[in-house]
Design a protein with these regions (language model features):
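Bacterial N-terminal signal peptides
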Residues: 8-16
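Short helices/loops that flank or line small-molecule/ion binding pockets
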Residues: 60, 65-83, 88, 92-93, ...
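Bilobed "Venus flytrap"/periplasmic-binding protein-like clamshell domains
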Residues: 26-50, 110-178, 194, 262, ...
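Bacterial N-terminal signal peptides that target proteins for export
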Residues: 1-9
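Extracytoplasmic small-molecule ligand-binding "clamshell" domains
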Residues: 23-87
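Pocket-lining segment of extracytoplasmic ligand-binding domains
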Residues: 135-137, 141-240
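An extracytoplasmic/periplasmic, membrane-proximal ligand-sensing/linker region
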Residues: 25-44, 50, 195, 219-231, ...
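A structural signal for short loop-to-beta-strand junctions that line the ligand-binding cleft
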Residues: 95-110, 223-225
Length: 293
């Protein structure tokens, strides 16, 4: 009887701990600059949401290739990923945006971002047309700011990245692309806006060592080559109850710029979900993924 009692107690504890694990709210975050950077940026957001919602919220840094399997399999409850991932997961699996992040630059709110086409400052490449036959690196073909925005721009200017480059490589992380261009491994590359400025602020590069191809001159505070698109959304996976999704979205939108969660992620805060129709148009234009003809 004693052994049976111990066994039953063990089973009960297993059930309790399993239930506790299931009760966690799991947010999958696209780790565009690696898992350590993702945790440094977003762990405080998990802590903030835990306090606001009264439920444990955990941050799971994910590689580009991990996002779709985790959404499809229900391994995460919410996803924070680039805008293209969002519209694809929306179309295929019914994820729903609950908030859109508002980036920060010198305290100014930025709800959009763009793509940057960069070369070394001493490169003979001057125009998009000059990129034909050159070695070009993107972050991942699935990276919106680090590939797909520039891909659309190139197609609109008569260059097919899949046919017209000597090499069309993936760097895996934004920093890798910048360093590959800096070290002459690649002739040119593309990353999302604010990558160069952040790397310069971290002492990894000097902005003067690079030149921007097809630079757009406007009041946006980061260099960019493409039109601007809405920032990353936080999205609820289809299995999440609507009330819980709404509460998490409201909690994010209540975040102030002085909170550690905002400071660590370099955000002003969060807004209601943006209009992502321009993102869908981009994926249609490059004939990509769920939007391929």
């Amino acid at each position: 009887m004693k052994k049976m009692g111990v066994a039953l107690l063990g089973l009960l504890l297993l059930v309790v701990f399993a239930g506790a694990a299931e009760a966690e709210i799991k947010i999958g975050v696209l780790a565009k600059r690696g898992p350590e950077k993702a945790m440094a940026d977003w762990k405080a957001t998990g802590d903030y949401l835990t306090a606001k919602l009264g439920e444990p919220v955990v941050i799971l840094p994910l590689k580009f290739v991990d996002i779709e399997p985790m959404v499809k399999g229900g391994g995460i409850d919410f996803m924070l990923a680039n805008s293209a991932f969002y519209v694809e997961m929306e179309k295929k699996y019914g994820v729903k945006a609950v908030a859109t992040l508002i980036n920060s630059r010198d305290g100014k709110p930025l709800k959009e971002f763009g793509g940057v086409v960069l070369v070394r400052a001493d490169s003979p490449i001057q125009t998009l047309a000059d990129l034909k036959g050159k070695k070009f690196m993107c972050v991942k073909y699935s990276s919106f700011g680090g590939a797909q925005m520039a891909w659309r721009l190139l197609l609109e200017n008569g260059i097919n990245p899949q046919q017209d480059f000597a090499v069309f490589a993936e760097g895996g992380k934004h920093d890798n692309v910048v360093l590959a261009v800096k070290n002459k491994v690649m002739d040119a590359g593309t990353v999302r806006s604010d990558t160069l400025e952040r790397m310069a602020a971290e002492g990894k590069i000097n902005m003067a060592d690079f030149r921007i191809i097809h630079q757009v001159k406007d009041d946006f505070p980061f260099v960019h080559s493409t039109i601007l698109y809405p920032e990353w959304p936080m999205a609820a996976v289809a299995h999440v109850e609507a009330g819980k999704a709404a509460r998490l979205g409201a909690a994010l939108q209540a975040l102030t710029s002085t909170d550690p969660a905002a400071k660590n992620a370099e955000l002003v805060g969060w807004s209601s979900p943006a209009d992502y129709s321009q993102v869908r148009e981009c994926l249609h234009a490059i004939n990509y993924g769920a939007f391929a003809k």
